[in-house]
């Protein structure tokens, strides 16, 4: 009898185990993902993503349905899609402010393979140590300089500084000393001035009212440990206005043209001046190489084009890197099933780690990828893109993130640009510029609510 009971018990256990495995098998079949959806932000690369989708399905069997929002309609399109059965599994935000709008749909990506391979973790959108947005491309800007002209300066017998190479220029004081001495020696160097013209024509002033202005805003928010997803970004005190003025004055006073004439100058004018070696330096981003190399009569060789951080005279100058960032962050829909979330994470990791995917990223999408999965021969050949990557890989250097995504409005930026032109022309004093920046930031932030 005992033997029979033992056999019966073992039989029941076996039947239970078989039932359990069968149940799990059905669950696995139910959870098997055949497709995911991606809402693409960039219409100009929609066709490339169609190719990528086809390749990925060929290699993995998973279909990536790529939908693309029309220009300037991404937020509206995302909002409409999220309320339907066609909600994207993969979407994007533009930074901390975008995360604040979509945090209920952003999955934790801290343990994702793509985030683990992010070269600089500070570039991600993070909250309380967890990553919710992973940048899929980066761009950067700083002071572009012509190494050949700088070498010519360092070799001058009559130069007034002791500096011998750009490797020694690690703070604003050093930069100022070299720039002002170069301006005095412009005839010997064969230039019209050190810096290209500070383009302050309306519509061409974004390098100053946005890109340069990013520095004091970043410095203030960092100093005060501001939560970038909070309402604390609705006001600023412009605490680092003096530092902004330091570098802006250096640009104005050591230029190829008089400050009073800058109201008609464009970005194209500045890049042409640099390309034709009328100057040694210009502030701009890695996208500028195509402008420089495309200028008729360009004299600047690819091997001579380098980057220097925009030093402004803060205590952190010597550890400051380039301004590197993006307005493009991958997010995985936390409302999708776990299997769908995993499939989305697998897709973006494949795109940035497989040979096929990396070829698309570098050569067809044209991205500078911020991940350590790329070998040297898989990285962009553009000299400024290479400089961005070189600065990112420097030990002890802190990249300046793009906090200008938090600027309250285009009106704020336009007003700031107009005030900078008035300052350059001598019709507005700096204190008035400071007050306008503080007041406009508050009023435009309030109007946006």
Language model features: what each stretch is:
Residues 6-10, 22-98, 111-116, 120, ...:
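Conserved N-terminal structural module of periplasmic/extracytoplasmic solute-binding proteins
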Residues 59, 63, 84, 256, ...:
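Extracytoplasmic/periplasmic substrate-recognition and gating elements
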Residues 132-136, 141, 173-232:
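Extracytoplasmic/periplasmic solute-binding protein
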Residues 34, 58-68, 86, 158-166, ...:
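A local structural motif
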Residues 177-180, 223-264:
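Glycine-centered hinge/linker elements that transmit conformational signals in sensory
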Residues 94-151, 304-310, 381:
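Hinge/lid segment of periplasmic solute-binding proteins
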Residues 324, 366-373, 386-442:
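C-terminal capping/gating helix-and-loop segments adjacent to ligand/active sites or protein-protein/ligand interfaces
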Residues 68-77, 170-174, 261-276:
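Short helix-initiation/N-cap motifs at beta->coil->alpha
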């Amino acid at each position: 009898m005992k033997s029979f009971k033992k056999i019966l018990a073992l039989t029941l256990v076996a039947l239970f185990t078989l039932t359990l495995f069968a149940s799990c098998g059905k669950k696995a079949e139910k959870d098997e993902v055949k497709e995911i959806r991606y809402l693409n932000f960039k219409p100009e690369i929609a066709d490339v993503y169609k190719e990528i989708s086809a390749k990925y399905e060929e290699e993995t069997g998973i279909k990536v349905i790529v939908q693309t929002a029309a220009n300037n309609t991404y937020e509206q399109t995302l909002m409409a899609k999220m309320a339907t059965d066609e909600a994207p599994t993969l979407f994007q935000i533009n930074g901390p402010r975008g995360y604040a709008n979509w945090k209920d749909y952003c999955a934790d990506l801290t343990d994702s393979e793509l985030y683990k391979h992010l070269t600089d973790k500070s570039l991600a959108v993070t909250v309380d140590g967890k990553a919710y947005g992973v940048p899929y491309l980066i761009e950067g800007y700083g002071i572009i300089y012509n190494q050949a002209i700088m070498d010519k300066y360092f070799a001058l017998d009559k130069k007034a500084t002791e500096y011998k190479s750009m490797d020694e220029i690690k703070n604003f004081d050093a930069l100022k000393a070299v720039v002002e001495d170069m301006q005095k020696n412009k005839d010997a160097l064969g230039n019209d001035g050190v810096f290209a013209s500070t383009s302050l024509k309306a519509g061409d002033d974004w390098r100053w009212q946005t890109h340069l202005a990013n520095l004091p805003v970043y410095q203030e928010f960092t100093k005060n440990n501001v939560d970038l997803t909070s309402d604390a970004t609705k006001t600023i005190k412009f605490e680092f206005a003096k530092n902004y003025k330091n570098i802006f004055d250096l640009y104005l006073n050591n230029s190829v043209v008089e400050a009073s004439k800058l109201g008609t100058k464009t970005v194209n004018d500045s890049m042409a001046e640099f390309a034709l070696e009328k100057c040694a330096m210009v502030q701009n981003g890695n996208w500028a190489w195509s402008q420089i190399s495309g200028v008729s009569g360009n004299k600047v060789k690819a091997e001579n084009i380098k980057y220097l951080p925009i030093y402004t005279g803060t205590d952190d100058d010597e550890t400051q890197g380039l301004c590197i960032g993006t307005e493009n962050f991958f997010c995985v829909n936390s409302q999708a099933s776990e299997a769908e979330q995993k499939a989305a994470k697998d897709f973006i990791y494949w795109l940035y780690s497989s040979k096929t995917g990396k070829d698309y990223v570098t050569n067809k999408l044209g991205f500078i990828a911020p991940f350590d999965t790329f070998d040297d021969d898989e990285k962009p050949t553009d000299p400024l893109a290479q400089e961005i990557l070189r600065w990112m890989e420097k030990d002890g250097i802190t990249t300046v993130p793009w906090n200008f995504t938090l600027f309250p409005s285009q009106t704020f930026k336009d007003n700031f640009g107009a005030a900078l032109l008035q300052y350059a022309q001598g019709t507005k004093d700096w204190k008035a510029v400071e007050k306008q920046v503080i007041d406009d930031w508050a009023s435009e932030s309030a109007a946006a609510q």
